[in-house]
Design a protein with these regions (language model features):
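Surface-exposed interaction/gating patches
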Residues: 116-169, 174
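A short, N-terminal "cap"/entry segment at the start of jelly-roll beta-barrel domains
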Residues: 1-36, 95-140
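Short acidic-glycine-tyrosine-enriched beta hairpin
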Residues: 69-88, 173-193
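Glycine- and acidic-residue-biased ligand/ion/polar-headgroup-sensing regions
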Residues: 54-69, 152, 159-175, 181
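Ligand-binding loop in jelly-roll beta-barrel domains
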Residues: 73, 84-108, 189-214
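The feature marks the first
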Residues: 23-72
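Short histidine-centered beta-strand/loop micro-motifs
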Residues: 41, 49-54, 71-72, 91, ...
Length: 214
């Protein structure tokens, strides 16, 4: 079953209950054709073990807790990228919340790696109050974590190739609304906005330049 498969549409989904200790999985995007995969926010209970078959590329971000991927422990803000053909066994001892993006990529992707959240390299963003940690750079797409201190305002900008945001902490804002932790926002190709934060600040996962443009 397809869900939010039309990339020309702006989508906002609240999955705040999962980040607040809920269980289960919130599907953010899926398509009828199996090769397109799906995007979800999943809460894994303590002591669970599961497998990734490796038939598609898997991107994984640890939102809460810890997960072991093929025996390697990854804590909060850690990012793993498993190329197609790379199966994995995953387990969590105390439970975790994960962002999972499983798909066949639009561009060649053969690299598999993991970045630990505690050792990410943060750099100054384009305006004061922003810190950016790059997670993956593709031919057209870019994936990063962005930390916003309270009362930060960013420049108005246009999303060439679209933008996808998952709010990890705090409250993210723009002229269209306010988005607490656990909110997923997908903005289409050539959409625009002027984001900012209030007194809470925010940390977000952001992916740009990767959506369908037709």
């Amino acid at each position: 079953m397809s869900l939010h498969a039309d990339h020309s549409q702006r989508i906002v989904i609240e999955a705040t209950a999962i980040l607040a200790g809920g269980r289960g999985e919130k599907i953010l995007e899926s398509r009828d054709a199996a090769e397109h995969g799906r995007i979800s926010l999943r809460a894994q209970p303590p002591g669970s073990t599961w497998a990734h078959a490796g038939t598609r590329l898997l991107e994984l971000l640890v939102v809460r807790g810890h997960v072991h991927v093929n025996g390697e422990e990854l804590g909060p803000s850690s990012y793993a990228r498993l190329a197609s053909g790379r199966p994995a066994t995953l387990r969590t001892e105390a439970g975790c919340v994960l962002y999972l993006n499983e798909r066949n990529p639009a561009e060649p992707a053969t690299d598999s790696f993991a970045l630990r959240g505690a050792t990410l390299k943060w750099r100054q963003g384009m305006v004061p109050g922003l810190k950016v940690a790059s997670l993956h750079e593709g031919l057209t797409g870019h994936t990063a974590l962005v930390h916003w201190v309270p009362e930060t305002r960013f420049n108005p900008h246009t999303h060439v190739g679209g933008e996808e945001i998952l709010v990890l902490d705090g409250v993210f804002r723009d002229e269209h609304g306010s988005y607490p932790a656990g909110t997923w926002i997908r903005s289409p190709h050539l959409s625009n906005h002027r984001p900012f934060t209030g007194p809470e600040g925010a940390t977000i996962l952001v992916k740009v330049g990767h959506l369908d443009v037709a």
